Amino acid sequence: ILIESVPGLAKTTAAQTLATCVSGSFKRVQCTPDLMPSDLVGTQVFDFASQKFTTQIGPIHANFVLLDEINRSNAKTQSAMLEAMAEGATTIGGQRIALPKPFMVIATENPIEEEGTFNLPEAQMDRFMMKAVMTYPSPDEEARMLAMLTRRGSDMIGPDTITGERISVSDVDFLRKAARRVHVSDAIMRYAVDITATSRGAGSRPIKGLSSLVRLGASPRATTALTRIGQAKALLSGRDYVVPEDLKAFAHEVLRHRIMLTFEALADGVVSDQIVDKIVETVPVP
């Protein structure tokens, strides 16, 4: 999951809280320009006592990994991160080490600051299943947050304040497998394909003039992600089958970082969410 927002909206706290709710291992990596792949993945260290190399695994070998401000890490380190995400394993000194299951990467980025940052390439952005954009809270929500801070006498709301029973790793694995068993009809599959194909200028009802706004549409990986998330949404709704509303509910999160706009569209102030709105509105619902 990629989380984007301006500073001060608790991206890091939200990611930490999600990981803390599950009793699995959690590691946080503060990304900086000098962060090396070995700092993340691990390395081999020579032990003078035994005269042998020993493998020290890095922080990415955890159930939940928070990559804070991922766009501050250099391209080489970003590639190492996303290789682990894609393959579910790392290679240290020629030795292939599998990552624990479940494995989830939560990355945050600040879209405003550009100095000392390295934007994620399109191919690497596509590795993220979802991209969530956090917006400012409403005045009522901000007032409730302030009231919570005042009552607790603390200036921060941290994940360590969570009380109650946490979800076990085995529970998460069970829910993942249960979601995969949710029925997806042929009509829903075609609907998911139609949504992503429309972003590429194809589909059953191509959008006129889309090529002047979009230079790169969503890949087939987006179709898979949209279907998987639809299955999870159906499971959480108490159904054993997927309906079109399950896909539409998360179309923005799945597609917004996979649709690359043209320079003309960016100059006119067009954002990818507007394109997704048009796609969802245009594609016929089965």
Model-derived features: positions:
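Residue-level signature of catalytic and energy-coupling elements of molecular machines
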Residues: 3, 40, 81, 128, ...
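Walker B catalytic acidic pair
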Residues: 5, 68-69, 80
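Conserved alpha-helical scaffold flanking the Walker A/P-loop in AAA+ ATPase domains
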Residues: 46-66
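Canonical AAA+ ATPase core
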Residues: 47-52, 73, 85-182, 231-233
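Walker A/P-loop
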Residues: 1-32
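Conserved AAA+ ATPase small/helical "lid" subdomain
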Residues: 157-204, 208-223
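C-terminal engagement/docking regions of AAA+ P-loop ATPases
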Residues: 177, 201-286
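Conserved beta-strand position immediately N-terminal to the Walker
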Residues: 1, 65, 103
